[in-house]
């Protein structure tokens, strides 16, 4: 029996919905040249040539850590 849980990939609309943040904010957090860069925000993963996604567990952990800071 397999005890590992499946890795779930979230596309950008789901990340926007889960975080409550705008697309531009998320991409600012990912951009080291942006003054809004957040090194703790989970990195996007390339799913194909033009598609990216985020691992849901990483987004959930990031949100959990952010809640602890508030």
UniProtKB/Swiss-Prot annotation:
Keyword line: Activator, DNA-binding, Transcription, Transcription regulation
Gene coding for it: alpA
Domain of life: Bacteria
Any one GO MF annotation of this record: DNA binding
Biological process according to GO: positive regulation of DNA-templated transcription; single-species biofilm formation
Function of the molecule: Positive regulator of the expression of the slpA gene. When overexpressed, leads to suppression of the capsule overproduction and UV sensitivity phenotypes of cells mutant for the Lon ATP-dependent protease. Part of the cryptic P4-like prophage CP4-57. Overexpression of AlpA leads to excision of the CP4-57 prophage by IntA. This inactivates ssrA (the gene upstream of the prophage) that encodes tmRNA which is required to rescue stalled ribosomes in a process known as trans-translation.
Protein name, UniProt field: DNA-binding transcriptional activator AlpA
Organism for this UniProt entry: Escherichia coli (strain K12)
Binding region for DNA: 12-31
InterPro entries membership: AlpA, Prophage_regulatory_activator
